Amino acid sequence: VSMENGARNGEKLRAGVLSMARDGAERGLVESAFLDWLEDECRVGFPWSMIDKITPHPSERVQEELGRLGVADMAIARTNTGTLIAPFVNAEITEYLVLEDAFPNGRPALEGAGVYLTDRTTVEKAEKMKVGTCLNPLHTALAVYGCLLGYTSIAAEMGDADLKALVEHIAAESLPVVEDPGIL
């Protein structure tokens, strides 16, 4: 299952896996029977997914908490391009995973963990709603203008009446053109 947050991610994962397997077959590293098995969609599934879980830059608060718990070597570093990196990932609590229920060999009870299992069309609608209309454009607008105004978090930006009004206006213009996926 691809957790890459992009359109048709299962299709892209399948293409990548098959490309590597075909290359392996051409080199004599993979038997043709394995390649046939891998290409059989009745045997191997590459379901599409849409995940929504914001993972901001590494938090010093999370780093300190990990240190208190005895977890070593959790230093936050800055790359040559200015990106903050760390051996841990902190994330917002809110999360959504919409997953195409396309598992030809069965699957665990993912719905018990809050996963939305549905058909491919609904996954695609949810992805378009998030990426193209209801979340990413709003977040991007806040990020750009917030940075220009000196803010360091989306939460702080939402406390600014002008930025909040901007986001509400963008949302009001966007919502009429989005197709409700029927979930979320």
What are these regions (language model features)?
Residues 1-184:
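Substrate/ligand-engaging "lid" and interaction regions
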